[in-house]
Amino acid sequence: MKAVGVWFLSQTTGRYLYLLRNDIKHPGSWGLPGGKIETGETLLGGMERECVEELGSFPNYTRLMPLEKFTSADGVFEYHTWVCVVDQEFVPVLNDEHLGYAWLDQGTWPRPMHPGLWSTVNLESIQTKLASIENAFQKS
């Protein structure tokens, strides 16, 4: 099974979008928009569909970049995390999967965080990539 998550970064503020989950798995934890890739769907197609479902739209973006691919030990599950740079923060129109949202500075992690995202943000390689992305797209 494949799934995808997208970390929106506002070029104007340098902050990232998080969603507060309201679902059965890990309710009350903070995560990213995204979900399961349907049969016959591409990663990008699934990402766009999930964002439309969870945010009300897939916002216009400056750049879309793969950040990480996690594969479970048994090879059955893949989770693809992307960074999507948008010009400005936006107000998502949340569906019933989420209770709220927050735009936060990198390193200001919402708590409790979804365990998969927590594992990702604690990787030094991810911290380095995020810092590089922020530096590349930071407005003066």
Question: Positions of the model-derived regions?
Answer:
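A conserved beta-turn-beta hairpin within the catalytic core of GNAT-like acetyltransferases
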Residues: 25-28
